[in-house]
């Protein structure tokens, strides 16, 4: 069983995926409009819970709302969506947050911007390296002052990781300066 199969095997509630697919598709279309990216031609549905196996256990802090999309290339294409809010709701809060305390919006209780920026960079780097270790290759990086999108792929799927910033959003130039270095590792 390869990485994509392991992801999908974690969610067996096909009916629930069907019921949520239209809402997720609308969300996704809106995000692509905001990010000025071309939508993938083959999108449908997949689960909600699966990126846990891809995430490195290293992060001690998550100060953003992280959302992951997995797009499968197949005759009946699927995509998988998971976010920190959903993870918290299904009972894996400690896995994502470490020892940090989060409010209802999954924002860490700190106002030290320098510290916050270092944590974001660290979380992104650990995620990136964990996914590369699972067989994903980088496509590109896209960012604004409020969000950053990391895109990776395998022969079977494409994965996008979105980090949504709120009150601690650093300038995009600084985000790009740190995160673009990740691609030099491969």
Regions found by a protein language model. Give the residues of each.
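Charged, low-complexity intrinsically disordered regions
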Residues: 3-67, 71-186
């Amino acid at each position: 069983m390869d990485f994509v199969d392991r992801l999908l095997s974690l969610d067996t509630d096909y009916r629930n995926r069907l019921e949520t697919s239209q809402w997720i598709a609308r969300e996704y279309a809106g995000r692509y409009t905001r990010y000025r990216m071309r939508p993938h031609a083959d999108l449908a549905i997949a689960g909600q819970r699966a990126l846990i196996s891809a995430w490195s256990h290293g992060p001690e802090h998550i100060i953003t709302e992280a959302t992951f999309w997995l797009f499968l290339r197949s005759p009946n294409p699927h995509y998988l969506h998971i976010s920190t809010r959903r993870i918290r709701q299904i009972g894996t809060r400690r896995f994502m947050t470490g020892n940090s305390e989060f409010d209802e919006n999954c924002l860490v209780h700190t106002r030290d911007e320098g510290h916050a920026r270092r944590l974001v960079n660290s979380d992104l780097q650990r995620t990136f390296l964990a996914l590369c270790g699972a067989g994903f290759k980088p496509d590109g990086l896209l960012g604004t002052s409020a969000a950053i999108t990391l895109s990776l792929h395998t022969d079977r799927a494409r994965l996008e990781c979105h980090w949504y910033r709120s009150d601690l959003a650093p300038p995009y130039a600084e985000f790009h300066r740190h995160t673009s270095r990740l691609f030099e590792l491969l």
